[in-house]
Structures are given as structure tokens and as C-alpha cells.
Design a protein with these regions (language model features):
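Bacterial Sec-pathway N-terminal export signals of envelope proteins
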Residues: 22-85, 261, 267-303, 471-472
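Amphipathic alpha-helical coiled-coil scaffold segments and their short linker/junction regions
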Residues: 36-40, 92-123, 259-322
Length: 472
């Protein structure tokens, strides 16, 4: 009985352990579309983009509230532990002196008044405490923005801002579909690679074991065994690399989907290359791209900004009113019948109009107009860039399709060469070295083929994204 090599046993043991853990862990099945739908609900970046739309809508409602009556109430209570002191001119002493002189004169007595004593400035000021220990006031006020050009323009800007955030959601959706699709294809391609590698390992291992048996019987040299063992070890190393690559690509897919669970992912779509016809290079419609749409909205906002500055010359009118009750006491008996509350009411309005600002607003308008012109140039440049990107994406895809066709043909030829060389060797009419060379060529053809498959799939996603057709 032919013994398996130690590293073969190690790989087999690792595979069994992996399968055991996989059976213990839960699995979730996803097609490509299901992966995308899952990402819509769980990708943090996409969810933030949707939240930005809600925030923009709430911001518009906030601005709408500025035109509604602003009503407020307040209650104020003060306890003056030291009643405020006021300093007054001494009008009491001159008045008292004048009264005394007048009384003496009325009595018929000869009295001559002193003018200095009639001047209150010749007496020291009087310090007096005015008020009560406790003062309370309850008031209600209301104001209404009757007219403001800034408000009207700002309200229009909030509507455009909502459009901006909606387009940003579309852009995030396109990016998400692109990222999830590429990650999904990466997993599929690597799993196809591992299947072919496993098949090649099985074939080469059988050939190696047979060659060892022939060597023991003296039919082949040890160098023939060594050559096959080197080739076998290289395949095992390649297998381990692809296994790790599958794990990495699955983690990338989970990340793009926003998948936080530890469960295994089972991809239900197969790697079928059916639609691989070349694309006719045509002019890309830039208006279908979210980036172009975002700049269009930005241009509308630039126009609104110019209007806002121009309308800033118009006045702003605000109406307001207030009503209050106040009570002043030396104790806290505020709600007895003998104590009175004193009402105050007012109604007013404020009209604000800028007369001259040193031409500041004029130059702000000129800057805003230049921003609009810069936006036009940026929009035109983006249109040219999108057209170039679409043409480049079509060329890249067509090149990938052509490369895939060549690599598929090379793979078929390599398989045939390997099969023929193996049969010739088993029949004793071929050399061991011929088998090794055929196997090496087959491995390279498989790598090139799967790279071409992945490139074709990725370039197709890039083409659909560049032409604005990735998300319908």
C-alpha cells in the first residue's frame, strides 16, 4: 500500500477541521442581488447617506418654522436682600428753607433770604432706597417675521439641498453596488480556482504515488520522483494561498455588505461567463451620472446665492407684542385680594433696511457671480471627464473580453497537453519532464484564465458605472 506524504495528511486534516467548524457555524445564503439588498440595509456609509436626506428634510421644516409666530413666556422672581440705593440731588433742604422764609414773610417779619441756601448744589446728595423687597413678573411675548428676502431665498435653497442629498444617496448606492459586485465576483473566482487546483492536486498526487511505486520496482529513477514532488509541493503551496485568499475575499465581501455576524456566507450564484460580447464605444450621456447631477444642483444653489445677495437690499419687517403682570411686595403675599398686580402691554414692529454698507454687498455679489462661472467650467470639465471615462471603460472591457477568449483557449490547450503527456508517461512512451512542464503550463494557464475572468467582470461593472447604467 502506498503511503501519503506528511504534508498531504496535514492538508487533509486541516480541510476536515475547516469542514467541522463550518458545520458548527451557521450559514447564510446570498445571491449577488441579495448581497446588494443586504448592503442597502446594513452598510454604514449608505445608511448615513439616507440619514442625510432626513436631516435635510428636517432642516427645511426648521426654516419653515421661522415664518411662524414665535411665542414665549417667562416668570421672574427677585428677592432684594439689599434694596438698591439711588443717589439724588438734595432738593429737600432748599425747599424747606424756602418754605420757612415764605412763612416768615407772610407773618410780616423782615427776613432776607440767603441765595446760597436756595441752591441744591450747595447741599450733599441724598441716598435713598427705592423699591420693595420682593418683585415678581409674569410675561408673554410673540413675534412674527412679516417679510424677509433672506428667508424666502433660504427656503428655496433648502429644497435644492434636499435634492442634493437625494442625489448623494444615488451616488452612494452606485458605489455600494460596484463594491459589493466586485467583492462577490472575487469570492466566486477564487472558489473556482480552488476547485481546479484540488483536481490538479488529486491527479498529480496519483501520478506521484505511481511513480514512487515504479521507482521502488526499479522502472524509474529517483530524480523523476523528485521532479514530481517539487511540482506537487508547488501545487500544495498554491492551494494554501488560494484558501487564505478565499477567506480574505469573503471578509472583504462581508465588509462591503456591512455584515457583522460570524456566520459563514454561502454564495448561490455561479461563475457563468455567458454575455462576453464586445461593446461598441459610444458617447456617454453625462446627465445620467450622479456626479454630474450633483454639480447641476450646486449650480442652482450658486444662482440662489446671487439672488439672496441682491435681495439683501430689501427691508426686513418683524412685528412683535408682549403682555406682562408685575407685583412688588415687602412680603410673599402675592395672591391675596388686597395686593394688586400691575399689567403692561405693548405692540410694535421693527423695519430694518441697510442704507450704505461700504459696497460690501456689491462685491459679495460679484464674488457669487464668479462662483457661478467657476461652476459652469467645472460642469463642462466633468462632462468631458465622464465621456472619457466611459470610452476608456468600454475599451478596457473589450480588451478584457478579448483576453478572456485567448486565455480560455490557452487553458483548453494546456489541459489537453497535460492529459496527453500524462497518458504517454503512464504508457512508458513519454518523459517525466514532459509531464512536469505540461503541469506547470497548465497551472499558469489557470491563473491567467481566472485573472482574465475577474478582470472582465470588474471592467463590466466599471463600464456600467461609467455610463450611469449600474443602478436602474
Amino acid at each position: 500500500m502506498i503511503k501519503l506524504m506528511p504534508h498531504t495528511l496535514l492538508v487533509a486534516f486541516s480541510v476536515m477541521m475547516f469542514q467541522t467548524k463550518a458545520q458548527e457555524a451557521k450559514t447564510n445564503s446570498f445571491s449577488l442581488q441579495q448581497s446588494i439588498d443586504y448592503a442597502y440595509k446594513n452598510s454604514p456609509n449608505y445608511l448615513n447617506a439616507e440619514n442625510d436626506v432626513l436631516m435635510a428634510k428636517y432642516k427645511r421644516k426648521e426654516v419653515l418654522g421661522m415664518a411662524m409666530p414665535q411665542i414665549g413666556t417667562s416668570v421672574d422672581m427677585k428677592n432684594f436682600m439689599k434694596i438698591p440705593t439711588s443717589v439724588l440731588p438734595n432738593f429737600v433742604a432748599p425747599a424747606s428753607y424756602s418754605g420757612s422764609i415764605g412763612a416768615l414773610q407772610q407773618a410780616g417779619l423782615p427776613v432776607v433770604a440767603d441765595p446760597a441756601r436756595l441752591d441744591q448744589n450747595n447741599y450733599p446728595e441724598i441716598a435713598a432706597n427705592f423699591g420693595t423687597t420682593f418683585q415678581a413678573q409674569a410675561s408673554a411675548s410673540a413675534s412674527l417675521l412679516v417679510f424677509s428676502a433672506d428667508y424666502l431665498i433660504g427656503l428655496k435653497a433648502t429644497k435644492e439641498y434636499i435634492s442634493l442629498m437625494n442625489i448623494n444617496v444615488t451616488r452612494s448606492k452606485v458605489d455600494l453596488v460596484s463594491q459589493v459586485s466586485k467583492a462577490y465576483y472575487s469570492v466566486l473566482v477564487n472558489k473556482e480556482r480552488i476547485q481546479l487546483l484540488n483536481a490538479n492536486i488529486t491527479k498529480l498526487e496519483k501520478l506521484l504515488n505511481d511513480t514512487r511505486a515504479f521507482n521502488k520496482q526499479g522502472f524509474v529513477e529517483q530524480i523523476d520522483v523528485d521532479r514530481l514532488e517539487v511540482a506537487f509541493n508547488n501545487l500544495i503551496t498554491e492551494q494554501q494561498k488560494v484558501v487564505r485568499l478565499i477567506s480574505l475575499s469573503e471578509n472583504v465581501l462581508k465588509f462591503q455588505m456591512g455584515y457583522t455576524g460570524q456566520d459563514n456566507l454561502v454564495l448561490t450564484d455561479s461563475l457563468s461567463i455567458t454575455d462576453n460580447s464586445e461593446i461598441t464605444v459610444t458617447k456617454t450621456d453625462a446627465t445620467k451620472r450622479s456626479e454630474y447631477q450633483l454639480l447641476e444642483v450646486q449650480q442652482r444653489l450658486n444662482t440662489i446665492n446671487v439672488k439672496r445677495l441682491k435681495f439683501g437690499y430689501l427691508p426686513t419687517l418683524v412685528a412683535y407684542s408682549s403682555f406682562s403682570y408685575s407685583g412688588q411686595r415687602n412680603d410673599l403675599k402675592y395672591f391675596t385680594k388686597e395686593h394688586v398686580w400691575y399689567p403692561t402691554a405693548l405692540l410694535g414692529g421693527t423695519l430694518s433696511l441697510s442704507i450704505f454698507d461700504g459696497f460690501q454687498r456689491h462685491y459679495k455679489i460679484q464674488q457669487a457671480k464668479l462662483d457661478f462661472k467657476k461652476g459652469e467650467n467645472t460642469l463642462r470639465n466633468l462632462q468631458l471627464a465622464i465621456e472619457l471615462e466611459g470610452a476608456s471603460a468600454a475599451v478596457n472591457y473589450n480588451n478584457a473580453v478579448a483576453s478572456l477568449q485567448v486565455q480560455k483557449r490557452n487553458l483548453d490547450l494546456s489541459k489537453n497537453i497535460y492529459t496527453v503527456s500524462q497518458k504517454k508517461y503512464e504508457q512508458g512512451v513519454g518523459s517525466n519532464l514532459e509531464v512536469i512542464n505540461a503541469q506547470t503550463s497548465l497551472k499558469e494557464s489557470e491563473i491567467n484564465y481566472f485573472n482574465a475572468v475577474y478582470d472582465m467582470l470588474v471592467y463590466k461593472v466599471d463600464y456600467l458605472k461609467a455610463t450611469g447604467n449600474l443602478v436602474k
